[in-house]
């Protein structure tokens, strides 16, 4: 009996960690509908390199999409974008809050947004000139982030 218990415990010890953080490659069509619409609207012609579902304890927590041209988009579990990284290229203006577009075009006319991250407090924006900016949830400028 003791031996059986030890075998079961050893099997559980081996299997549980595998379930805990099992990231899985999926097809673009398996993304939430909101994520698919976002990709079709802003990156319709970009070829998908891979789509990964990030999992914790067997539950999908987020999605990572990598497109040709060094574009990376992260989505929440529900399909809302959380970050868009276009490498050295411009993040499409339609992705950006209007306040971000206006501020960057007026204060940094020779730069463009190459990366944006959305969180519960607002937006973190990286410009092509390596300046990082913080914006509030309504797109209002807060500070230059150093």
Walk through the language-model features, giving the residues of each.
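Bacterial Sec-dependent N-terminal signal peptides
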Residues: 1-23, 39
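Interaction-mediating elements
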Residues: 21-146
